[in-house]
């Protein structure tokens, strides 16, 4: 015991160390840095802090009280190390192996009373207890997160090309052209079928199919009609001369 009634510790002693905002943590005394101030090594997180004796509790006497399971990251690993590997160093078990543990995240600690009570990483870092450096995103990782809201995500589906309507119009134009060509071919076929009849009529010959075109009058019929007309005219002249003609004088 010290002159102040506080227990005295030596290097290698196992204790529970209490930081404000954290549970009583399994730790090991490294050495005394100044009167009533100890540097302690935290099991599970491999960080260090400078604490006064009033924040340190003997491990064996307080094991049942403070050694209950805790969901904070690194606590279960710390209990295992203090029992099975109490001489572990920071380089023996990298802190990165703790990232995959299922102990859950650490809650934010309360403000410490002094700078000397803040835990520091055994490798020289100044992070909080139970929060490894790897959990903090770097500036390079934060860079992509600063993308403006107007920029579309890279995985977003691309908009359909504007050339699609043009292709549809071209297809419609091709279909219309094909329809026009088919209509022209049908019309040409119809003209070819009617042309023999027209040629036959123009040449004065009878068409190959009767009944489709009126036959022109035959020359013999015209001559007969002309003869009939001439006979009628001659008969009329004879009857006109008969009543008062020169035949009476001859009689």
From Swiss-Prot:
Example of a GO cellular component annotation carried by this entry: nucleus
Entries under InterPro entries matching the protein: PWWP_dom
GO biological process: chromatin remodeling
Range of residues in the leader sequence: none
Region described as Disordered: spans on this chain: 89-251
Gene3D superfamilies: 2.30.30.140
Extent of Acidic residues compositional bias: 218-235
Biased composition (Basic and acidic residues): 128-144, 155-164, 236-251
SUPFAM superfamilies, sorted: Tudor/PWWP/MBT
Recorded superkingdom: Eukaryota
Domain PWWP: 11-62
Family designation: Belongs to the HDGF family.
Protein name: Hepatoma-derived growth factor-like protein 1
């Amino acid at each position: 015991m010290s002159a102040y009634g506080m227990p005295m510790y030596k290097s290698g002693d196992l204790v529970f160390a209490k930081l404000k905002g954290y549970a009583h943590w399994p730790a090991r005394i490294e050495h005394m840095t100044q009167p009533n101030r100890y540097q302690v090594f935290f099991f599970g997180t491999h960080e260090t802090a400078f604490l006064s004796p009033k924040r340190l509790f003997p491990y064996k006497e307080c094991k049942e009280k403070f050694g209950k399971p805790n969901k904070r990251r690194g606590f279960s690993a710390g209990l295992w190390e203090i029992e099975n590997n109490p001489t572990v160093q920071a380089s023996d078990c990298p802190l990165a192996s703790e990232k995959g543990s299922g102990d859950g995240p650490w809650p934010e600690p309360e403000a410490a009373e002094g700078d000397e009570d803040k835990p520091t990483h055994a490798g020289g870092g100044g992070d909080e207890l139970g929060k490894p450096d790897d959990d903090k995103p770097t500036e390079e990782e934060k860079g992509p997160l600063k993308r403006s809201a107007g920029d579309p995500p890279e995985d977003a589906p691309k908009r359909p090309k504007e050339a699609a309507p043009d292709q549809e119009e071209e297809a419609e134009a091709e279909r219309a052209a094909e329809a026009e060509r088919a209509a022209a071919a049908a019309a040409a076929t119809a003209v070819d079928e009617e042309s023999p009849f027209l040629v036959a009529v123009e040449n004065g010959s009878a068409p190959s199919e009767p009944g489709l075109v009126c036959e022109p009058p035959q020359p013999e019929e015209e001559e007969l009609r002309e003869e009939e007309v001439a006979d009628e005219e001659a008969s009329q002249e004879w009857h006109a001369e008969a009543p008062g003609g020169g035949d009476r004088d001859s009689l």
